[in-house]
Amino acid sequence: MRNIIAFFREFTDRVEQRYIEEWEYEVGQSSKLSLFRSIASPCIEPESYLFAVKLRKYRAGLAKLRCSAHSLRIEKGRHVNELMAERVCRLCERNGDYVLDDEYHFILCCPSLAELRVQYLPMDVVTNPDYSKFIKLLKDENEDIQTGIAAFIFQASKCRGDLVLTV
C-alpha cells in the first residue's frame, strides 16, 4: 500500500513539474504577455484575486488587465499593426503629452485618473509610483488591495471611456 501511495505522490509531482515547465516555456515564447509574465506564476491553484474580488464586474476588469485582454492602446494598436510610438494615451495626448498607453500608465500615471487612484489604491504607491511598485501591487494577495485595484480598473475604465468619447 505504501508503494502505491509513494508512486502516486511521485507521479503527481512529476506531472505538476512538467506542467510548470510547459507553462513557463509557452508564456516565455509569447510576445504579448510581458505584464502577465511579471505578475503570474505557474500555479496549479487559481489566482487569489478570483476569490478575493467579490463583484464580478470588478473581477472581470482585473482579469482582463492581467492577461492583456483590455482596450488600452498598447494592446489595441498591436491588433492593427500600429507602431509602438503611436500607441499613446488619448487623454494625455489631448494635453500635448505623448505617453505610451500601457497598463502601468493606466493604473499609476495617467493624470486624468489621479482622483480615482487616491480613492482606491494604497497611498505609498500613488504618491511615489514606479514599475516595481506596480508589479508588487498586482501581485499583492491582500483582499482589500485586490478589491481596490479591481474597483479602480472598473471606475477608471468607465471614466476613460467617457473622456475618450469627448476627445
Residue ranges and their predicted role:
Residues 2-6, 10, 14-17, 22-167:
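Family-specific functional microsites
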